[in-house]
């Protein structure tokens, strides 16, 4: 993959979840912004919540950007996460 997420932090307070992370471009080329989906998985690997996000700017080659998502979904029982790219920004 040409990008990865690091320094993932998930906090939940009063059914309000905040997700922050760095998005790292691991290539020698700029990559456009894109839509993505984060799924919270329980210990059995079942999806318990999901949220979609948008990285709305170009990430320069070998650099990173950050995301900050607030959602009214409860990720409190999250054991693992799954991230998938949905599509590039048109």
List each language-model region with its residue ranges:
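Hydrophobic beta-strand segments
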Residues: 35-38, 53
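Low-complexity, acidic Ser/Thr/Pro/Gly-rich terminal tails and inter-domain linkers that flank the onset
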Residues: 1-20
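Asparagine-centered strand-capping/turn motif at beta-strand->loop junctions
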Residues: 23-27
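Terminal connector regions
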Residues: 2-5, 50-52, 68-90
């Amino acid at each position: 993959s040409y990008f990865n997420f690091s320094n993932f932090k998930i906090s939940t307070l009063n059914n309000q979840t905040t997700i922050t992370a760095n998005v790292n471009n691991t290539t020698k080329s700029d990559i456009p912004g894109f839509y993505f989906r984060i799924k919270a998985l329980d210990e059995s690997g079942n999806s318990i919540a999901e949220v979609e996000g948008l990285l709305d700017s170009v990430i320069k080659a070998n650099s990173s950007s950050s995301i900050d998502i607030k959602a009214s979904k409860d990720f409190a029982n999250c054991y693992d996460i799954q991230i998938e790219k949905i599509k590039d920004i048109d």
